[in-house]
A protein has these predicted regions:
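Amphipathic alpha-helical interface elements
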Residues: 1-153
Length: 153
């Protein structure tokens, strides 16, 4: 994997699918210049995780299946804990807002990155080789260019 597709916050997902790391790393790289794109990429990240889970568990879907429908089917089959269901739905909803409203604050994108990381950690603990003993380390936030501006206010 080249330097452009690494992410200290998500590298542990390489074990599952390089696409997961690529999408998460793209979201992180976009953060400073385009927080809106960060949320769109994070929605795609959650979609990739959901599709992976569906394929793994035999839940049928195709390109016409909405993320909401896929999550409903997955929840019926896998019985997600409420917090996991909420992680998926928050990334879906915030990604939709970013796609259709065109404005995202850095604070919202940072929240999205933290939510995506929580989903990634759940996924890795549930399906990774390390299992529940996986220790992810601290979240490393990307630099927030609006933080300085907020301090001045």
């Amino acid at each position: 994997m080249n330097q452009g597709t690494t992410s200290t916050n998500f590298d542990f997902l390489k074990e599952h699918d390089p696409l997961f790391v690529e999408l998460a790393a793209s979201a992180e790289r976009a953060f400073a210049s385009d927080p809106n794109t960060t949320l769109i990429k994070l929605r795609q990240f959650a979609e990739a995780i959901a599709q992976h889970l569906a394929a793994r568990s035999g839940v049928e879907f195709d390109e016409q299946t909405s993320q909401a429908d896929l999550l409903y089917r997955l929840n019926r089959e896998l019985r997600f804990e409420p917090v996991v269901r909420e992680l998926f739905h928050t990334l879906r909803i915030e990604g939709n807002k970013a796609t259709h409203q065109f404005r995202t604050q850095h604070r919202e994108a940072m929240d999205g990155l933290k939510i995506a990381r929580a989903l990634a950690i759940w996924f890795h603990r549930a399906f990774g080789k390390a299992g529940s003993s996986f220790k992810p380390g601290a979240f490393v936030p990307p630099k927030d260019p609006s933080a300085h501006q907020r301090q001045l206010q």
